[in-house]
């Protein structure tokens, strides 16, 4: 009896060259898609931050209606208007929030990105509800009302809550 020699060609599977081609194609697709994905993640974090600043502005109006002045993030949190993560500097969605200024007639809440890879801009909101952004990483607090308003880029200012009543001018 003659035995047939089994040929490697009859075995099922992929050759090494076929696998290398598939890996190369996947690598090319990943190299093209990764930067876009990272930009979408940054945009998502920025959008979440803008929405948080809008909510904080509305909470400031609620606080000032009862206290006749604006509050710090810590005071808003103690008043039950804000999640503790915003007030304790823990960071939310890659941004750290602080309120360097809160008086009877003005406030400023800032959202500073934790790293350069978190987002492309830092944000702040002041008593009139205008949310502004600063492109350069802010090493120190952003001065009151400094930055480009989102409305200059097609965004909107925060509707709704009005600022605290202004004291009478003498």
Predicted regions mapped to residue ranges:
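Phosphate-coordinating loops and pocket residues in cytosolic domains that bind phosphorylated ligands
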Residues: 34, 39, 75-78
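Alpha-helical hydrophobic helix detector
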Residues: 20-36
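A short acidic/small-residue loop/turn micro-motif
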Residues: 138-141
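N-terminal leader/signal peptides at the extreme start of proteins
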Residues: 1-14
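Extracellular/periplasmic head regions of type IV pilus-like filament subunits
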Residues: 58-131, 135, 147-170
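Aliphatic-rich helix starts adjacent to a transmembrane/signal segment
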Residues: 36-53
């Amino acid at each position: 009896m003659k035995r047939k020699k089994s040929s490697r060609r009859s075995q099922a599977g992929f050759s090494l060259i076929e696998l290398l081609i598939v890996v190369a194609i996947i690598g090319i697709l990943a190299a093209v898609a990764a930067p876009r994905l990272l930009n979408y993640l940054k945009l998502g974090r920025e959008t979440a931050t803008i929405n948080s600043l809008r909510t904080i502005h509305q909470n400031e109006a609620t606080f000032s209606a009862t206290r006749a002045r604006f509050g710090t993030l810590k005071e808003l949190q103690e008043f039950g208007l804000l999640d503790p993560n915003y007030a304790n500097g823990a960071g939310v969605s890659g941004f750290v929030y602080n309120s360097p200024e809160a008086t009877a007639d003005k406030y400023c809440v800032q959202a500073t990105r934790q790293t350069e890879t978190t987002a492309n801009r830092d944000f702040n909101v002041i008593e009139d509800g205008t949310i502004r952004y600063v492109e350069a990483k802010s090493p120190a607090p952003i001065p009151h009302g400094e930055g480009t308003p989102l409305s200059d880029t097609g965004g909107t200012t925060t509707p709704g809550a009005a600022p605290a009543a202004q004291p009478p001018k003498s």
